[in-house]
C-alpha cells in the first residue's frame, strides 16, 4: 500500500472507469468560479494537459504495488485521458478489448441475406471483364486406335502407311506437273470422243439436210435465171429441136422452168433422206469403233 501523497498513488477518481475526470472537472470549476481570479502564471486548461505530459515524460514515477484484482493506471494514462477529453479525440483501444470488438453491420450483407442469397446470384451472373480474354481450349487430335491382332495388325498398318505415302507422293507429283504446265504457258487438255448419241445425231442431221434443201433450191433458181438471161436455154432448145425434127419430124422444148425446178425438188428430197440416214448409221458405227480401238482424240488449249 502507498500513501495518498506519493506521486505514484492513484487519486480518488482514478479508477478503471475514469471517474477522476468528473472530480477534476468539478474542482476546476470551483477553482475558476466567480469568487477566484486565476493567476496570470497559470496556463489555460487546454494547455495544462500538454504541460503535464511533458513533466511526466521528464520524471519517472517509482514502481507502486497495487492490491490484487485492481488494474494499474499510471498518471500518464490519466493525463492522456484528460487530453483526449479536452481535444475531443477517441481513445485508442488496446489490450484484450482491441481483440474483442463488436462487428459493424454491413449493409451489403444485409441486402444479401434471405432465401437464395440474391447478392451471390447477381455476382455469379455478371461476367468478369477485368481479366484478359479467355482463350478457347485447344482440342488435341484423337490418337489412332491400336489395331488388334499382333503381326497381322502390324502388316495392315504398314500396308496402310505405304498406301498413304504412295497417295501423297502421287498427289505431290500431280501438283508439280500442274505447276510446271502453268509455268510453261497455255493450259492444254487432251480428250477423246468416246460416244455419239444416235438420236441426237438423227435430229441434227435432219435439220441440216432441210436447211441444205432450201439452199439447193435457191441456187437452182438463181442459175436458171442467169442462164435464161444469157439465152443459153433458148439456144439449147433450138439446137435440140433441129436434131429431133431431122430425125423424127417433131419439135419439142427440152429445157423449161417446170422440168428444172421439178428435178431440183426431187434431188433435194433424196438428199434429205440420204443425209439423215447416213448420219444416224455413222453414229452407230462410230460407237462400235470406239469400243474397240478408242475414240477420236481432241486437244483443247487456251488461246495464244
Curated annotation (Swiss-Prot):
Q: Which Pfam families match?
A: DUF3566 (PF12089)
GO CC annotations? peptidoglycan-based cell wall; plasma membrane
Write down the InterPro entries for this protein, in alphabetical order: DUF3566_TM
Q: Disordered: where is this region?
A: 1-183
Q: Could you tell me the keywords of this UniProt record?
A: Cell membrane, Membrane, Transmembrane, Transmembrane helix
Q: How does it sit in the membrane?
A: Multi-pass membrane protein
Q: Where in the cell is it found?
A: Cell membrane
Output compositional bias ranges, type Low complexity. 132-166
What the record says about family reads: To M.leprae ML0007.
Supply the name of the protein.
Uncharacterized protein Rv0007
**Species of the source:** Mycobacterium tuberculosis (strain ATCC 25618 / H37Rv)
Amino acid at each position: 500500500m502507498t500513501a495518498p501523497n506519493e506521486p505514484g498513488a492513484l487519486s480518488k477518481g482514478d479508477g478503471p472507469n475514469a471517474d477522476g475526470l468528473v472530480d477534476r472537472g468539478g474542482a476546476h470549476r470551483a477553482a475558476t468560479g466567480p469568487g477566484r481570479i486565476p493567476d496570470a502564471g497559470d496556463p489555460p486548461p487546454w494547455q495544462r494537459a500538454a504541460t503535464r505530459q511533458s513533466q511526466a515524460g521528464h520524471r519517472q514515477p517509482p514502481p507502486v504495488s497495487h492490491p490484487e484484482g485492481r488494474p494499474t493506471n499510471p498518471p500518464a494514462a490519466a493525463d492522456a485521458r484528460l487530453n483526449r477529453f479536452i481535444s475531443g479525440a477517441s481513445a485508442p483501444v488496446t489490450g484484450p478489448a482491441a481483440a474483442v470488438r463488436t462487428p459493424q453491420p454491413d449493409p451489403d450483407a444485409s441486402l444479401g441475406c434471405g432465401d437464395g442469397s440474391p447478392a451471390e446470384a447477381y455476382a455469379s451472373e455478371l461476367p468478369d471483364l477485368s481479366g484478359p480474354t479467355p482463350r478457347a481450349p485447344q482440342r488435341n487430335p484423337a490418337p489412332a486406335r491400336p489395331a488388334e491382332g499382333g503381326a497381322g495388325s502390324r502388316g495392315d498398318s504398314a500396308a496402310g502407311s505405304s498406301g498413304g505415302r504412295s497417295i501423297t507422293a502421287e498427289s505431290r507429283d500431280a501438283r508439280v506437273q500442274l505447276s510446271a504446265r502453268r509455268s510453261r504457258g497455255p493450259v492444254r487438255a487432251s480428250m477423246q470422243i468416246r460416244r455419239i448419241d444416235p438420236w441426237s445425231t438423227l435430229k441434227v442431221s435432219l435439220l441440216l439436210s432441210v436447211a441444205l434443201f432450201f439452199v439447193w433450191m435457191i441456187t437452182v433458181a438463181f442459175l436458171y435465171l442467169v442462164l435464161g438471161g444469157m439465152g443459153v436455154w433458148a439456144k439449147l432448145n433450138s439446137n435440140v429441136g433441129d436434131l429431133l425434127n431431122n430425125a423424127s419430124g417433131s419439135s419439142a422444148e427440152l429445157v423449161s422452168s417446170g422440168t428444172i425446178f421439178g428435178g431440183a425438188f426431187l434431188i433435194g428430197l433424196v438428199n434429205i433422206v440420204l443425209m439423215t440416214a447416213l448420219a444416224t448409221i455413222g453414229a452407230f458405227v462410230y460407237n462400235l469403233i470406239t469400243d474397240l480401238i478408242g475414240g477420236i482424240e481432241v486437244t483443247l488449249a487456251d488461246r495464244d
